[in-house]
Amino acid sequence: MIWIVAGLSVLIVIIFIIVNIKDNKNCKTNQIMQAPLTDGNVSVFMDNNGKIDVIPFNFNKLKQGRASDFPLTIMKPYTQDDVGALIREGLKLSGSEKSLSSKVLMEALGFFDWKDYSKGRKSVSLTCKKQEIAFNSTIRRSDGSYAFRVRGFEKVLPAKLSNYELGNEVLNMIKLSI
């Protein structure tokens, strides 16, 4: 009888250990660290259906932003990891020497002009520089342009974010956009 109780106790302990190990692995899968983010700039746009466009851009000599590559797009369903990976790719592309005209950018997005494209879309702007990434949620103006909600950077984090953390941060910031 005592052997049965001892055996059951050992079995319960083993099951408890296995369950805890599996739970810890699931927690850590969302926190896998990536290489630090590449210096660059992207604007992230989300429409009413949850479709996300990431537009890589760089600045000209007059400090005007211009798309530096074609937009990257992801449709629902997606995870924070998926969104973070797309933004990471956009940051890499922002360093390209390309410079897309507004016409080419609008054709790639499937719209005639910026005002039409921006209607109903929320936006977050990201700038990664010197191992920091700055986030700014925006307010859409009546002419279709966007302005930062706050002066300066709304949030600054170290550039050593996992795709999950990056995607999660952007999805939370986009909720603040108007």
Residues covered by each model-derived region:
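N-terminal signal-anchor transmembrane alpha helix of single-pass membrane proteins
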Residues: 2-26
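Charged/polar interaction segments and conserved charged motifs
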Residues: 3, 126-130
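Low-complexity, intrinsically disordered/propeptide-like segments
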Residues: 11-14, 103, 112, 129, ...
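Intrinsic disorder/low-complexity detector
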Residues: 25-36, 89, 93-127
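Intrinsically disordered, low-complexity regulatory segments enriched in Ser/Thr/Pro
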Residues: 39-82, 131-168
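Generic marker of "main functional regions" within proteins
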Residues: 62-64, 93, 97, 101, ...
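Repeat-associated, polar segments at repeat-unit boundaries in modular proteins
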Residues: 79-100, 166-176
